[in-house]
Design a protein with these regions (language model features):
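Terminal low-complexity/charged segments
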Residues: 1-185
Length: 185
């Protein structure tokens, strides 16, 4: 595909029933889909000779706690041959299980584990879905907007016990409310 406009037309014509919306901005093609179409759309953009998006750059989530579908899943793909990028996205409910891309892109393994660890999003058929960035006994998911800024526990090395211990967070100072409104306006 020579241009993003050509790519957009190709994808819209080939995947008519699987694409909710497309938009070109910032030299990238943004595609909104339903979660059930993720595997089909991903296989198409990876294997089709006119697209060749053979590198998965990243998988992440965005937390919108006020929305009925709390999380927006975002997938970034790169076509080295055409020097183009696609960003796939869809929204899901809080406890929804979504398809894993590890069978299509092995690199999705750690990316999906990171999303699971940070947001609590589960991936169906993932080969090793466990925490990757936080401790094994860690409670909660730190990138959710309802997670406390200080966390629940403090992990530190105890000189007395000669080991790493975990204890509830003790703040030296209470939270302060800052009023940023100007009295002169």
């Amino acid at each position: 595909m020579n241009t993003l406009e050509d790519l957009e037309k190709k994808i819209n014509s080939e995947l008519t029933t699987k694409i909710n919306n497309t938009e070109i901005k910032h030299d990238q093609l943004y595609i909104k889909i339903d979660k059930d179409d993720l595997v089909d759309v991903t296989l198409f953009i990876k294997t089709n000779q006119d697209t060749k998006f053979r590198q998965l750059i990243d998988i992440t989530a965005v937390d919108y706690p006020e929305n009925s579908q709390r999380f927006k899943m975002v997938y970034l793909f790169l076509s080295h041959e055409y020097n183009q990028r696609i960003i796939l996205s869809y929204s899901i409910n809080e406890n929804e299980v979504i398809p894993s891309l590890t069978n299509i892109f092995p690199a999705a393994n750690w990316m999906e584990r990171e999303v699971f660890d940070m947001y609590g999003v589960s991936f169906k058929d993932h080969p090793d879905l466990r925490r990757i960035l936080t401790d094994y006994g860690f409670e909660g998911h730190p990138l959710r907007k309802d997670f406390p800024l200080t966390g629940h526990t403090e992990v530190r090395y105890s000189e007395e016990q000669k080991k790493v211990i975990s204890e509830p967070v003790k703040l030296e100072q209470n939270y302060r409310n800052f009023d940023y409104e100007s009295p002169w306006e």
